[in-house]
Each structure stands twice: as C-alpha cells, then as structure tokens.
Amino acid sequence: FQMKNKIYIFFLLLLFLPIKLFAAELNKFEISLKKDERCFHSNGIPNHKTGIFPNKGNPNSISQQKIYVCVPRYPKKSTASTKIKGIIGIALNGVLFRPATAGFWDPKAPRGHSRNGNKNWSVDIFGLKGRLGLDFNNAHVGRGGMYHYHGLPTGFVNNLNKSHVGYAGDGFEIHYIKGKMSAWVLKDGFRKSGPLGKYDGTYNEDFFYLGSNDKIDECNGGMYKGKY
C-alpha cells in the first residue's frame, strides 16, 4: 500500500495521547459499530516486529497511544475530492496510515527541507536519503511516540490471508492487491523552478497522474469485487 502525491479523504476523527509504559507493550485493537459509524480503539502498538527506534534517521521511541477513530460505516463516493496531508486511515491492527511528511523544500535548512519550507514542494519520504529512519515495514515514529505507516506495512500484510488491510478516513476499505500499481508516475525532464534538478521523486510534485481505464483513479481508488 503506497500513495503518491495526492491523498483524499472526507472524514477523520483522531485522538491520541502518549502513555509511558513500564512493562512489555502488546497490541490492543477493537472495532465497534454504531448506527452510521465504524469505530476503532487502539493503543497504536503494532502486532508485528518493528525496526529499532530511535535510529540514525529517527530520534523517537515507540510509545503506547490512545487512539479513537470513527469513519462512515456506509461510505458514498463524492463527486468532489478533498486533498489532505497527515493521517488518512487505519490498518486492521490499529496502526495509523500517514503517507505524507511534514517536510517541504527549504534551501536554508541543513537537510534541505523543513516544516517551514516552500509549500509548493512537499517532500516524498521514499525519495529522501535515509527515508527519515523508516523500518522494514515502511514505518517510523512521530514526535509523540506514534508508530505509523508511510507505505506498504510489510510485516502486517505478510501475516494476512486477505487483501483487506484497513479503512480510509472516508470509510472506504483499503486493500493491498499484489501487482496493482499507482497511476501516479514520475515526470520526465528537469524542474523549472524551486529545487532545480531532475525529477527524481524527492518531492510529491515530481509525479503526475497518468490515468486510463485499467488503472486506479486519481485518489488511488478503484473497483474491487464489485465495491469501490
């Protein structure tokens, strides 16, 4: 599961608070159904092995969270889409999906990017050297200790016997289907402004949507077994 450049959702409620643990941390995850909502309670601890944190690219340690997420139980596809950054969904183990980073091109910053950089050029974590300390699950840890996925949660999907891996904030199911690729592709040539140089995937703006009838849509969604 990997999203490029544009992520769209229509509803997301999140509350998390870091909790210090003095015992072994175990995954806790529950799903409850309300009239029109599907709600998730989680401590944010994955049910699979993780990389070592802190590490060279990420100074944060994993800590238990208090996560409460509700999404529409009966989602409807809208005629309009909303571009967002940040958390876009939750996996079926209670770990959150957050593909985008908080970094933007900043030639004055030591690393060449910062939270206060040029908003026209947002950093793609998979194009960065060191990938900000991502582990083998394409995940790392935020400042508050929240372990979260930026791409395909390898350790999680390897233990599944189904394609359904989670829910997006708009209520639609998230599936991992082997061989299915995003329709966002890398541009040819060189950037004409901003961080001059070849389009190399360092920034989300290095990609464009190349759609066709056999590819998923601009929101990385599509039909699967009769459902969007």
Predicted regions and their residues:
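Short, Lys/Arg-enriched N-terminal segments with co-localized hydrophobic residues
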Residues: 1-2
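Sec-dependent N-terminal signal peptides
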Residues: 7-17
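Sec/Tat signal peptide C-region and signal peptidase I cleavage site
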Residues: 19-23
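Solvent-exposed N-terminal domain segments of exported/luminal and surface proteins
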Residues: 24-128
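Short, low-complexity cationic-aromatic patches
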Residues: 61, 132-145, 210-227
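A mature extracytoplasmic/lumenal domain signature
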Residues: 75, 101-103, 151-153, 178-180
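Extracellular/lumenal glycan-associated surfaces
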Residues: 92-98, 143-157, 225-228
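Extended, compositionally biased non-globular segments
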Residues: 167-228
